[in-house]
Amino acid sequence: MPAATFFRRLSAIALGSAMLFAGAQAALAQQSKEDIEKIIREYILKNPEIIEQAILELRKRQEEAENKSRTDAIVQNKKLLTESPRGVVLGNPKGNVTLVEFFDYNCGYCKRALNDVSELLKNDPELKIVLKEFPILSPGSVEAARVAIAVRMQNPAKYWEFHRALLGGRGEANGAVALAAAQKVGLDIERIKKDMMSPEVAATLKESEQLGKALAIGGTPSYVLGDELIPGALPYDRLKLAIAQVRKCGKLDCPN
């Protein structure tokens, strides 16, 4: 932003704020807009650190606004996030805390998080986990997601075994690799090939895409826990703590 524009905006803000004070109205009436701008300019030049303070405050307010907008979106879409039949439910379907994970089969951090999710399932009997296919990294990711959804349609009980085989594998995930993983766990490959192109698969991908946009999810993995979004992978201990906090007070950070 050009300096002149910056100063003019600051001047406008200062002038607007000053008008709120009745005692200052008489003094302002005797000063021109140019005089006020000059005073502000001189003050800023003598105290340049105020610009950094203003920028930090602006960023803070923007972050707070973004977090509020995201929280509102989570609340508005809570049923789709946690109860949609198009999500894959792991763990306790009636658990007292639900962790939703958006993932991509070609996401390296998702691969690392696989063991953490497995540990959570093993160690927390009151946890419900919902997996959301969110293929954003490549066309191969979309192909793999289509196969995965077809696996869920054919045999939900086999999904977790398939998921671990595909996400835990090396190399790029795509349709062929995903089909091989499905065959390995004993599923009907011809039926999967047919179901991959079904309206249900398209609707599932569309649902995840719309949720991702509503929550402003820009990468994977991303977790929804309580009414908050956790962008990026967290190690097991931090995920466990976050779940405990939500269980305790409904938020990621409970007041002391």
Predicted regions and their residues:
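Hydrophobic core
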Residues: 15, 19-23
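Short pre-active-site segment immediately N-terminal to redox-active cysteine/selenocysteine motifs
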Residues: 103-106, 219
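C-terminal cap of thioredoxin/glutaredoxin-like
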Residues: 5, 28-41, 180-256
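N-terminal targeting signals for export/organelle localization
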Residues: 2-5, 22, 26-79, 255-256
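A short beta-strand-turn-helix
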Residues: 79-97, 121
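Bacterial N-terminal signal peptides that target proteins for export
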Residues: 2-14
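Structural alpha/beta surface segment adjacent to cysteine/selenocysteine redox centers
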Residues: 100, 111-183, 188, 193, ...
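The canonical Cys-X-X-Cys-His
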Residues: 107-111, 223-224
